[in-house]
Amino acid sequence: MEAMAPRTLLLLLAAALAPTQTRAGSHSLRYFYTAVSRPGLGEPRFIAVGYVDDTEFVRFDSDAENPRMEPRARWMEREGPEYWEQQTRIAKEWEQIYRVDLRTLRGYYNQSEGGSHTIQEMYGCDVGSDGSLLRGYRQDAYDGRDYIALNEDLKTWTAADFAAQITRNKWERARYAERLRAYLEGTCVEWLSRYLELGKETLLRSDPPEAHVTLHPRPEGDVTLRCWALGFYPADITLTWQLNGEDLTQDMELVETRPAGDGTFQKWASVVVPLGKEQNYTCRVEHEGLPKPLSQRWEPSPSTDSNMETTVIYVILGAVAMIGAVAIIGAMVAVVRRRKRNTGGKGGDYAPAPGRDSSQSSDVSLPDCKA
């Protein structure tokens, strides 16, 4: 099996978590682990990344020249040498655990040694505005598919297939869920509080979005209105198109919130509307950095009006040209068919193309909880 890039795997894990984003006013501590085997190229690569809310704050990469847990946010540079030594030790323990797990799972699935395989893990906790635990989680995947997950009760596991059932049985005998629950309810919450205090100038800020609407003509004659929200933090935001005050959630195209690369985020939502009816549609923007929701409409400029008239003319001319082309092609086909009937000729056959079908916690990285 071809290995996916570690960054892609981390993004997949993040995407898998997207439907369960934290509530407004809450905060999260999450770790994403990825191990990729590479036969013939040395030991598996192991990457660990930690996030507080939507901000990456630590990273470990076994392929680095000097593999160590390193700060990824400036406020984490306040931690002393003991912290980084302990976090590096924990990351290296996980690296060894995953080397064993890759071999173990390859055996569970009866896979050859020649292929490359991946293990992914995400674990962490969400806390409310009062600092109490809202949710704890651990999810594991193998070769991009669900493998095993801790249930919401923090006591039981859901195994995706026969191999994961073996792991579940091992973890149940080791009472691993009890220790993991203790970490999620205690250590995870405590360290999240510490990180929020260290990075409060960054993590607890609220940057309101800058919003505007753009218009994009379509060949069909109608137009797309796209509502943009830029430069906001935190990432939680709601964009809703409305027609005369009624939500159009079923008719919208909505992209996932994306990092802008400067510590803020961006997002857009679009809707297709009849030409000339643009002013009936409004985009509602809700974000904790706004004192009240924004309502945005497309605001045409004089040059835009001229461009729209030109667009309408082009659309009409294009339609006329298309009709004319269809008529010409139809006439040519008719002539060819008459000639074939007169000459008794047959068209050539063709074959269609075939289808393509650590937090700082030692109680989580326990060696007796391998797969």
UniProtKB/Swiss-Prot annotation:
Function: Involved in the presentation of foreign antigens to the immune system.
Region Alpha-3, residue ranges: 207-298
Protein name: RT1 class I histocompatibility antigen, AA alpha chain
Any GO CC annotation of this UniProt entry: MHC class I protein complex
Short name of any one Pfam family annotated for the protein: MHC_I
UniProt key word Transcription: no
Signal peptide: 1-24
Family, similarity comment: Belongs to the MHC class I family.
Keyword Phosphoprotein on entry: yes
Recorded topology in the membrane: Single-pass type I membrane protein
